[in-house]
Curated annotation (Swiss-Prot):
Main location: cytoplasm
Pfam families reported in the protein's UniProt record: Peptidase_M17, Peptidase_M17_N
Binding residue positions for Mn(2+) 2: 254, 259, 277, 338
Taxonomic source organism: Roseiflexus castenholzii (strain DSM 13941 / HLO8)
Name under which the protein is recorded: Probable cytosol aminopeptidase
Cofactors demanded by this protein: Mn(2+)
Family affiliation: Belongs to the peptidase M17 family.
Cellular compartment(s): Cytoplasm
Gene name of the record: pepA
Lineage of the species this protein comes from: Bacteria, Bacillati, Chloroflexota, Chloroflexia, Chloroflexales
GO biological process: proteolysis
CC cofactor note: Binds 2 manganese ions per subunit.
Reaction equations catalysed: Release of an N-terminal amino acid, Xaa-|-Yaa-, in which Xaa is preferably Leu, but may be other amino acids including Pro although not Arg or Lys, and Yaa may be Pro. Amino acid amides and methyl esters are also readily hydrolyzed, but rates on arylamides are exceedingly low; Release of an N-terminal amino acid, preferentially leucine, but not glutamic or aspartic acids
Entry EC number(s): 3.4.11.1, 3.4.11.10
Length: 488
């Protein structure tokens, strides 16, 4: 769907569908007030009412949508409102529709237009790749959304459309990748998708296979992947190396294309959802897509450890001791705590770039879902300034993060009696000890870990712009944080 902006009087605009957002206390403009019955409209948040003007206006249809109380404007609610409008436009089978940009206190036309664009594109997302019996009309999408703005706000709104569109396309790429079945998205295929992205934006990419990883000493990734016929890959994409004076930010993603648990095998119930155990890698690729589209003046290095964790005659075992890329030794106590082992090598490699910050994203622990549920990302960091930067970005982007502690007693819990660290510590503080394990592999560099295990997948539809399945979480937070970095 193409999104554009134009200036004009909404009530004089000829369109298949005119979307007009109204606050609870806002009066209906004439002649709309004469076209509905008293009591049919209140303006409560997300209420909708479809009106057929029948010649009273140039628009063929008008969709009123409630914005709630004017005293509590909310960009995330604007995303939801835009998603609802777009979905209704698709239901009505219109080719194009217009949306009047509301005025929100403490927000600019750019931020509001960005939120509307995000919500519309995220709300129109559907994963239909494996639906073989759909008719063409069932795959039909709206062609164009036109935002209506005052003349003096058109340029600002256009910038918002560019930003919101890039972010939404990045999120939807991440959703696509995490929704793919594991028989189609193997580590090798994930590397191919990464290469397609790199080629599209003319970015340098390096993909290491098992032989190259063995030669360089990637003992963690190799061990986790050795039980599967689908061999692991290590992927690096380098963006913005020409920005020599800009910070270097490393984005590290866990890319388990399927996680059976290995020898410490998971229960059968819900194991199918473990195709999304590469959501961290998906978020990194989605973010990089948006970064490249927006041409952010930063040096960003995307690093992904991709593997499949399977039981088998060659699988790694509880009791094994692994030598990682850093030289540190890991005692394996549970093969289902594999993501941290993969990330140990990825985080070690990231240090070669001497980054200003390393940010990793991973569906790392079920414990974070128990602690925070589906409403917040678990955030851990060895640098308070970096942590607060990410918290602020999450609030602004609509992807909240909550910081948990990494005190020394937690770091003591991951120490091994017979190796340097152990990959499992029991039930207590599971999300924290997993982060403490990762902390052992980042050196002295500022580092943050985003545990997205509770937010990467949804079996419901918690928000209008968030369908069932992969959420693409992390992309919006990262883009907001990186944009803030360019303005610091």
């Amino acid at each position: 769907m193409r999104v554009t902006v134009t200036a004009g009087d909404p009530l004089s605009t000829a369109t298949d569908l005119l979307v007009l957002g109204l606050w609870e206390e806002e009066s209906l403009p004439s002649p709309l007030d004469d076209l509905i019955e008293p009591g049919d409209w209140s303006g409560k948040a997300k209420q909708t009412l479809l009106i057929y003007p029948r010649g009273a206006l140039p628009a063929r249809r008008v969709l009123l949508i409630g914005l709630g109380k004017r005293s509590a404007p909310d960009l995330d609610q604007m995303r939801e409102v835009a998603a609802i409008a777009t979905q209704r436009a698709r239901e009505l089978k219109v080719d194009r529709f217009a949306f009047v940009i509301p005025v929100l206190s403490e927000q600019t036309p750019e931020t509001v237009a960005a939120a509307i664009t995000e919500g519309s594109l995220l709300g129109s997302y559907r994963f239909l790749e494996y639906k073989s019996d759909l008719k063409p009309e069932d795959r039909r999408e709206v062609d164009e959304l036109t935002l209506l703005a005052p003349v003096d706000a058109v340029d600002e709104a256009a910038r918002g459309i560019a930003r919101g569109g890039a972010v939404a396309r990045g999120v939807n790429l991440a959703r696509d990748l995490a929704n793919l079945p594991p028989n189609d998205l193997t580590p090798a295929r994930l590397a191919e998708r990464a290469r397609e992205l790199a080629v599209a934006f003319d970015l340098p990419i390096t993909v290491l296979g098992p032989a190259e990883m063995r030669e360089q000493g990637f003992g963690g990734i190799l061990a986790v992947g050795q039980g599967s016929v689908n061999e692991p890959r290590f992927i690096v994409i380098d963006y913005g190396a020409q920005y020599a004076d800009a910070p270097t930010i490393c984005l590290a993603g866990k890319g388990m294309t399927f996680d059976s648990g290995g020898i410490s095998i998971k229960p059968a119930e819900n194991m199918d959802a473990m195709k999304m155990d590469m959501s961290g890698a998906a978020a990194v690729l989605g973010a990089l897509h948006a970064i490249a589209e927006l041409r952010l003046p930063l040096h960003v290095v995307a690093l992904i450890g991709a593997a499949e964790n399977m039981p088998g005659g060659s699988a790694y075992r509880p009791g094994d001791i692994l030598k990682t890329l850093s030289g540190k030794m890991i005692e394996v106590l549970n093969t289902d705590a594999e993501g941290r082992i993969v990330l140990a090598d990825v985080l070690t490699y990231a240090q070669r770039y001497h980054p200003s910050a390393i940010i990793d994203l991973a569906t790392l622990t079920g414990a974070i879902s128990v602690a925070l549920g589906p409403h917040a990302i678990g955030l851990f960091a060895n640098d308070d300034a970096l942590a607060q930067r990410l918290v602020r970005a999450g609030e602004a982007a609509g992807e909240r993060a909550w910081q948990l502690p990494l005190w020394q007693p937690y770091r003591e819990m991951v120490k091994s009696e017979i190796a340097d660290v152990r990959n499992a510590t029991g039930r207590q503080a599971g999300a924290i000890t997993a982060a403490a394990f990762l902390n052992a592999f980042v050196g002295d560099y500022p580092w943050a870990h985003l545990d997205i295990a509770g937010t990467a997948w949804t079996d419901s539809k918690p928000k209008a712009y968030q369908p069932k399945g992969a959420t693409g979480v992390g992309v919006r937070l990262l883009l907001q944080a990186l944009r803030d970095w360019t303005q610091a």
